[in-house]
């Protein structure tokens, strides 16, 4: 509080009121501000903050908009996309809401994606981050170990997110982290062991704090922590964690639980051979995850469990051709740059999908199959300006015949050369 001066009456530099007219006058270097002006400034700041929050809420895509965006990149999995859209919308609504300490506390809801290899778990998480324009990082749970053992500390996951945000901590604190192969850190046996399980239960324990929300100390260069280094501090309260895993064998655990019980109006659950694995997974309960080897505390921190269906042949054909980043569209664009039209026969696409199913790699295996098929023709075409069209047939996929090539006449070749010259100049 400024001291009273008999010779000169002190005034607020903003409103002009004297010290006698206000409760308090705060002195600065050559200026004064009264308590009334401080309150007014606080009100202005609060109003602007509320406007920013309202704008953030208006900009947040609604669940239907989120699903529509996911539909552009991910084929099938409608139920999973709906569940993810609602969960992500609620998560960012919670961050952007003006929740006061005396109101209802909205807890964070991390997500567990459960589905076969190549069913779209990673792609779903990546696409969500792309839509929301937030930093995104992928971590592999199999590389993590408990602190003090050879391997990566869980804090290194956070470092990847910070790096994705260009070291903007505030942005990173609203990012998304996808932890893949989370099923591989299941406890080695259902009963707690007296020996250390440093890559299983130990990692689950280490992840608990950052999943729930804590101020984590992250080594800026990665690697192990040591007491004499500086740390980057990051609050994980608003980071959305999406954990994904195939959880192979969990369908048997679910079946053993519900197999003899009736569902609906006394209908018995069919055997695994008759029942689709995807349908069985829809009946998953926390107790099944517990039996699989996930610890109760971990299960409690990923309350939203989303199951993905195994991909069918038709799904894989659609994945090849329909999404914005479909592999066939990408190859067509690459060929177009060389002035060649690329076509895939329907039987060729069906066979590629069948090969991916046989390998058990799902959508992930499609690119490897296509690269193998396309290598020779992509090597030859740029050097031959007479080629106008390339058709990939079933025989091409089976490697019993090369692609069908259509050659242009001399007039077209001349126009093609002229077009190339124009683009270079």
From Swiss-Prot:
GO molecular function, one term: unfolded protein binding
Subunit details: Component of the ClpX-ClpP complex. Forms a hexameric ring that, in the presence of ATP, binds to fourteen ClpP subunits assembled into a disk-like structure with a central cavity, resembling the structure of eukaryotic proteasomes.
InterPro entries assigned to the protein according to its UniProt record, in alphabetical order: AAA+_ATPase, ATP-dep_Clp_protease_ClpX, ATPase_AAA_core, Clp_ATPase_C, Clp_protease_ATP-bd_su_ClpX, ClpX_bact, P-loop_NTPase, Znf_CppX_C4
Residue ranges of domain ClpX-type ZB in the record: 1-53
Residues annotated as binding ATP: 116-123
Stretches of the chain forming a coiled coil according to its record: none
UniProt keyword terms in alphabetical order: ATP-binding, Chaperone, Metal-binding, Nucleotide-binding, Zinc
Residues where Zn(2+) binds: 12, 15, 34, 37
Gene3D superfamilies assigned: 1.10.8.60, ClpX chaperone, C4-type zinc finger domain, P-loop containing nucleotide triphosphate hydrolases
Taxonomy, superkingdom: Bacteria
GO cellular component term of the entry, any: HslUV protease complex
GO biological process, one term: proteolysis involved in protein catabolic process
SMART domains from the UniProt entry: AAA, ClpB_D2-small, zf-C4_ClpX
Protein name in the entry: ATP-dependent Clp protease ATP-binding subunit ClpX
Family statement: Belongs to the ClpX chaperone family.
Species of provenance: Caldanaerobacter subterraneus subsp. tengcongensis (strain DSM 15242 / JCM 11007 / NBRC 100824 / MB4) (Thermoanaerobacter tengcongensis)
Encoding gene per record: clpX
Primary role: ATP-dependent specificity component of the Clp protease. It directs the protease to specific substrates. Can perform chaperone functions in the absence of ClpP.
């Amino acid at each position: 509080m400024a001291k009273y001066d008999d010779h000169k009456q002190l005034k607020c530099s903003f409103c002009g009121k004297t010290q006698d007219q206000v409760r308090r006058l705060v002195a600065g270097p050559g200026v004064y501000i009264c308590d009334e002006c401080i309150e007014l400034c606080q009100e202005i700041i609060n109003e602007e903050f509320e406007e920013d929050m309202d704008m953030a809420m208006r900009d947040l895509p609604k669940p239907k908009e989120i699903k529509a965006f996911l539909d552009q990149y991910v084929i099938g999995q409608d139920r999973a996309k709906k569940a993810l859209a609602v969960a992500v919308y609620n998560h960012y609504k919670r961050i952007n809401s003006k929740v006061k300490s005396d109101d209802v506390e909205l807890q964070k809801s991390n997500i567990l994606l459960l589905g076969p290899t190549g069913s779209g778990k990673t792609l779903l998480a990546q696409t969500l981050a792309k839509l929301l324009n937030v930093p995104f990082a992928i971590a592999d749970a199999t590389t993590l170990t408990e602190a003090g053992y050879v391997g990566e500390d869980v804090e290194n996951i956070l470092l990847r997110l910070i790096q994705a945000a260009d070291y903007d901590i505030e942005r990173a604190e609203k990012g998304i982290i996808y932890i893949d192969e989370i099923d591989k850190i299941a406890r080695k046996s259902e009963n707690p062991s007296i020996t250390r399980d440093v890559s299983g239960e130990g990692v689950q324990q280490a992840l608990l704090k950052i999943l729930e929300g804590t101020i984590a100390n992250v080594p800026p260069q990665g690697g192990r922590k040591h007491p004499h280094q500086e740390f980057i501090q990051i609050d994980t309260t608003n980071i959305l964690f999406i954990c994904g895993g195939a959880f192979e064998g969990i369908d048997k655990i679910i079946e053993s639980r519900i197999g003899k019980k009736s569902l609906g109006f006394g209908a018995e659950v069919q055997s695994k051979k008759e029942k689709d694995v995807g349908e069985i997974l829809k009946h998953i309960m926390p107790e099944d995850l517990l039996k699989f080897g996930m610890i109760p505390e971990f299960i409690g921190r990923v309350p939203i469990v989303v199951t993905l269906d195994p991909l069918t042949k038709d799904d894989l054909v659609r994945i090849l051709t329909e999404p914005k980043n479909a592999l066939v569209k990408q190859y067509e664009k690459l060929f177009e740059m060389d002035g060649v039209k690329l076509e895939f026969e329907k039987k060729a696409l069906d066979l590629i999908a069948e090969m991916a199913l046989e390998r058990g790699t799902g959508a992930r295996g499609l690119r490897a199959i296509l690269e193998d098929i396309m290598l020779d023709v992509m090597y030859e075409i740029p050097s031959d300006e007479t080629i106008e069209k390339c058709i990939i047939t079933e025989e091409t996929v089976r490697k019993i015949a090369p692609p069908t090539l259509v050659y242009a006449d001399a007039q077209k070749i001349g126009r093609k050369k002229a077009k190339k010259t124009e683009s270079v100049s």
